[in-house]
């Protein structure tokens, strides 16, 4: 079968962040226009702006952070195309935890990286559109994972209700994976309170509404840094934003 070779720099524009000009890390997409950036770059930009950095469309007049979402598919593509990128990012994270004297989470202790499998084909800035390693990976039977994210970095949370229209949780203290999202918490609260829909809830940190795709790790780093555990979050009935 014929294969087509593509120069890596020919697709750089599609896998780099317009704000930092580097390869996408923790890829995050604007839901209005589907332009993608590094999460940290986009969040920092939206602290003082409410438009997309690329097309300048207004994301939301007052709460643009609620209209961005983690793009796992794009991040997987970037890691597969750019040799060594995921290993380098994991190494930086480990160094960060070591510097602070904190235990390295289980999900970043190893350096398993699918991009490493493609290293030889990328040495000259080229990638094969039809890579046999993808076929081999697809043929492998996935191993059953019964860990339920227990080996992930864990976050302790206190869920408080700040509305008289909702009742408080019997057990407001929970501990879960740092990779869990605000959406997971909404579903958890809705189930415990027997609400008809989790979309009826807002979750806040420091009186700021959190986007449904924010991971707890992201919330801790950007909203609770240098504060003692547990992470304090409040929930209330959803309020329509003008």
From Swiss-Prot:
Segments for region (Interaction with BCORL1): 132-242
InterPro entries (alphabetical): PcG_RING_finger, RAWUL, Znf_RING, Znf_RING/FYVE/PHD, Znf_RING_CS
Keyword annotations from UniProtKB, A to Z: Metal-binding, Nucleus, Repressor, Transcription, Transcription regulation, Zinc, Zinc-finger
Principal place of residence: nucleus
Zinc finger (RING-type): 17-56
Signal peptide per UniProt: none
Highest taxon listed in the record's lineage: Eukaryota
Keyword RNA-binding: no
A Pfam family the protein falls into: RAWUL
Region of interest called Disordered, as start-end residue ranges on this chain: 115-149
Gene Ontology cellular component terms for the protein in this record: nucleoplasm; nucleus; PcG protein complex; PRC1 complex; X chromosome
Keyword Ubl conjugation: no
Compositionally skewed regions (Basic and acidic residues) per UniProt: 117-140
Record's subcellular location: Nucleus; Nucleus, Nucleoplasm
GO terms for biological process, alphabetical: random inactivation of X chromosome; regulation of transcription by RNA polymerase II
Any one GO MF annotation of this record: zinc ion binding
Quaternary structure (record): Component of a PRC1-like complex that contains PCGF3, RNF2 and RYBP. Interacts with CBX6, CBX7 and CBX8. Interacts with BCORL1.
Described function: Component of a Polycomb group (PcG) multiprotein PRC1-like complex, a complex class required to maintain the transcriptionally repressive state of many genes, including Hox genes, throughout development. PcG PRC1 complex acts via chromatin remodeling and modification of histones; it mediates monoubiquitination of histone H2A 'Lys-119', rendering chromatin heritably changed in its expressibility. Within the PRC1-like complex, regulates RNF2 ubiquitin ligase activity.
Protein name per the record: Polycomb group RING finger protein 3
């Amino acid at each position: 079968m014929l294969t087509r070779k593509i120069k890596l720099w020919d697709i750089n524009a599609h896998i780099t962040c317009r704000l930092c000009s580097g390869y996408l890390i923790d890829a995050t997409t604007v839901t209005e226009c589907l332009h993608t950036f590094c999460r940290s770059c986009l969040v920092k930009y939206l602290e003082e702006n409410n438009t997309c950095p690329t097309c300048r469309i207004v994301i939301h007049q007052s709460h643009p952070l609620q209209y961005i979402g983690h793009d796992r598919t794009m991040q997987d593509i970037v890691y597969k195309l750019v040799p060594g990128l995921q290993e380098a990012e994991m190494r930086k994270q480990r160094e960060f935890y070591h510097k602070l004297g904190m235990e390295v989470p289980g999900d970043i202790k190893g350096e398993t990286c699918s991009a490493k499998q493609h290293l030889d084909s990328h040495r000259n800035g080229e990638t094969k559109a039809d890579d046999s390693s993808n076929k081999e990976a697809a043929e492998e039977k996935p191993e059953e994972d019964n860990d339920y994210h227990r080996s992930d970095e864990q976050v302790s949370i206190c869920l408080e209700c700040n509305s008289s229209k909702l009742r408080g949780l019997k057990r407001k203290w929970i501990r879960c994976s740092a990779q869990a999202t605000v959406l997971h918490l909404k579903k958890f609260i809705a189930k415990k309170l027997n609400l008809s829909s989790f979309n009826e809830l807002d979750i806040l940190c420091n009186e700021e509404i959190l986007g449904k795709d924010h991971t707890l790790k992201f919330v801790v780093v950007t909203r609770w840094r240098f504060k003692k555990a547990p992470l304090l979050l409040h929930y209330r009935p959803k309020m329509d934003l003008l």
